[in-house]
Amino acid sequence: MSGHSKWNNIQGRKNAQDSKRSKVFQKLAREIFVAAKKGPDPNLNPSLRLVMDKAKAVNMPNDNIKRAIDKAAGNTSGENYDEVTYEGYAPGGIAVLVHALTDNKNRTSTNVRVAFNKNGGSLGETGSVSYMFDRKGYLVILREGLDVDEEEFMLEAIEAGADDVEVSEDVFEIFTDPATFPEVKEALQEAGYTFATAELSMFPTVYNEVAENNQTQFDKMLEALEDDDDVQEVYTNAEIN
């Protein structure tokens, strides 16, 4: 996966996301609420444990996390969210996957369609672009202050069950099969490593470059989608420079 570091992409968008931290926490609270409805104990509910780790990685306050779990445990109002995935193309044929948690599918569908249409994109049918992505476990370990040989670490990660390891100056990126993700994560934690990111994510099988004349519309479309309260994640196969 050399040359397509997801971590570089995360860092490239970090400043914009930091300015919207309250919205990030709001979306994570919804994700925690949905996961916690399957059980409030993260030791018995892997889905909840995963999203809690995700929340802690962005410094979401523990009180916020607990409040979302308690809300799910005491939910008597019938509040419920459906998981919905939208697929389409951004300007220049860039594939886009949008994952949402919504209590009103009509509202979310309309908002997503407007975000595509207003910015030169087109919303497609189910399956139109999802085949271009693979679901993988994804772990990031910051190298700052870490005294470990690159080859030694790669061997350690592979022995723990990782499928692939990408090494850069700043980070180790570990990729796993979704089914083995918890075991790999636990093995590396027991070896003393901590994670800047630990999640299941979608990765393109082929990357496409965003043409210079499409960049502004592409950025506006992503911003419109990410600003929507119902949208949890936006994945693209845009080339990361």
Curated annotation (Swiss-Prot):
Annotated GO CC locations: cytosol
Region (Disordered): 1-22
Biased composition (Polar residues): 1-14
Keywords tagged on the record: Cytoplasm, DNA-binding, Transcription, Transcription regulation
Primary localisation category: cytoplasm
Gene3D superfamilies, per database record: 1.10.10.200, 3.30.70.980
An example Gene Ontology molecular-function term: DNA binding
Superkingdom of this protein's organism: Bacteria
GO BP terms, alphabetized: regulation of DNA-templated transcription
Pfam families documented for this protein: TACO1_YebC_N (PF20772), Transcrip_reg (PF01709)
PANTHER family: TRANSCRIPTIONAL REGULATORY PROTEIN YEBC-RELATED (PTHR12532:SF6), TRANSLATIONAL ACTIVATOR OF CYTOCHROME C OXIDASE 1 (PTHR12532)
Membership in a protein family: Belongs to the TACO1 family.
Name of the protein in question: Probable transcriptional regulatory protein LMOf2365_1554
